[in-house]
Structure formats: structure tokens, C-alpha cells
Amino acid sequence: MSLESVRAFFAEKAPDIDVLVSSQSSATVALAAQAFGVEPARIAKTLSLRVGERVILIVAAGNARMDNKKVKTKFGGKPKMLGLDEVAGITGHEVGGVCPFGLKSPLPIYCDVSLKAFDIVVPAAGSTHSAVKITPDRMAELTSAEWVDVCEVAT
């Protein structure tokens, strides 16, 4: 799945967007920024969380940190990161390549307002060596994401 499912997602929904593949690892914000030649804040990281019985994905700017209190208020429960052993089974993507595109099964997706500081962001594309360049609004539109304010930007 993963890279292939993301390529299929874009072929169907946005054929004008190219999936970029790097020979360098893009498994972390810092590595992705280096691999794709952008500042770390432009990397759109996808957080895989369990809140109560629900699994949700929150996409945020690379320099943003999840605010547990805001997440608890918004979603009605304490957020817990999915375990490393759960991520691929639930999302279809390996850790370091998790993104809101080409998921194994539909999940609620939320885009944090921290992304709106940028005209173009660079989320992963299903593997630890791939990404796409996309506007935050287009990403939200393609994934049917809801905009939320649940992160704080590091200064």
C-alpha cells in the first residue's frame, strides 16, 4: 500500500500533483526539510492519535506542537499517539510516511491552522522517502479535512 496508494489517490483526485521521491530519508521533519529543500516549518506532519475509541489524524506545520488541552477540549478526550505497532495497520502507511492521502480505510482528518502560515506545504506521501507539494487549502479539500486550532507554534 503506502506510496502506491498515495499515487493512486492523486491520479484519481488531483493528477496535476506529482508525488516526489527522494533518495534521502524524509522520515522526520528535519530530514524531510533537507530532502525536499524547504524550511522545516513547511513540512506538514501527520499525527496519528487515539481519542477515546476514535482514531484521528491531525496534520500540522513542522514547527507546531500539539496542545493536549486544546485537543481534549475539541475532541472530548485525552489524546494518545498511536503505538508504532498500530500505525501501519490502521493508516496503511509506515511511521515516517504517514499522511492524509491514500489511507487504508477512511479516518477523520483535521488540518491545524498552523498550516495556513504557508502558501505551500510538504506532507509525506506514504513512505519515508516521498512527499507532495500542495497548498494547505487544497490538501484540506482533497482529504475532506476540517480546520482546527489544536497546536501551538514553537517560537
Go through the PLM ranges and name each one.
Residues 1-155:
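Extended, low-hydrophobicity, polar/charged segments
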